[in-house]
Amino acid sequence: MPKTVAYLGPEGTYTDEACYFYAPDEERIPFSSLGLVTSALEEGKVDEAVVPIENSLGGTVIEVVDYLITSEKAHIKGEILLPIDHCLVTRPGVQLSDITVVKSKQEALTQCREFLSTELRFAEQIPTTSTASAVTDLKESDDRTAAIGPRRSAELANLPILIQGIQDRQNNVTRFAVLSSNGDTPDNSDKTSIAFDFDRPDGPGLVFGALSPFADRDINLLKIESRPTGKGMGNYIFILDFEGHIDQPHVKEAIAELTKHTATFKVFGSYPRAQGLAGR
C-alpha cells in the first residue's frame, strides 16, 4: 500500500515538483496552505509531508521552523534541494511581442525583475496565489497573457514554454524537508538539525561556549541562525545544522555539553544530507 505524502499545492507548484521527485510512486496529497499540511501530519491523516524550509535567496521559511519547534510529533527524515527555474509560459503560438500581461506569485515576479524590466517592460504584472495557478489560468486567458511558473506546471497544463530560466539569479535553490513522525537509523552522510535557547538572555562567551563542544569534536557546523523567541527583546532561539547523527557518540557528547547552558532544546531530526540538486 503506498504511503501518503502531503505537500503545499496545487499540483504543478515547486513543492509539488519536490514531492514528485521524492515520492513519484506514492499517494501525493495537495493542501492549500502550510498550516493544513502540518495539521494533516500532526493529526495522522498522512504518513509524511514535504515542506519548503529554506531558500538560497529568501532565507528560512519561518512558519515551518516555528512548527518544528512546537511539534511533539514531526521529525525531519530527509531533504531535497530543488533548483528554482522560472519559465515564461504562454498559450500556443504566442510570441514575446504579443504579451501585455504577466501573472505569477509575487515572489516569482520579483525574482524575474530584470527579465521583465528589459523584455516585457510595458507588460502589466498581476500577482496570483501560486505559480501553478497562474499557469493553469492561461487556459481561460487570451493570447496577450503569459505566466511565470515551473516546467512541471506547464507540462501538466499542456502549454508551451516560451523561455526557460528567466530568473535573475541562476543559483536560486529551495531546500525542502521531508517530515515524518519516525526517525531514521544513522547513515554515513547524515546531518542533524536542532534548535535551542539559553537559560539567560545574554552574556560574554555564551554562544562561543555553546558551539565550542562541536569544534572540540571536529563536528562540522553547516548552518547557524537566530530568530526572536517572542519572550522579549534580546531573547533568541538558535537553529543549528551540523554533520553527523544524533545517535553517534561524539555527537551525543557535544549535545550533552550544549544542553548544560540551554533552557530549551529540540532535535528537528537526523537525516541523510542531500547529494546534489534534484533532477540534475
Q: Residues of each region from the PLM?
A:
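Domain-level signature for soluble enzymes in the chorismate/prephenate branch of the shikimate pathway
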Residues: M1-R280
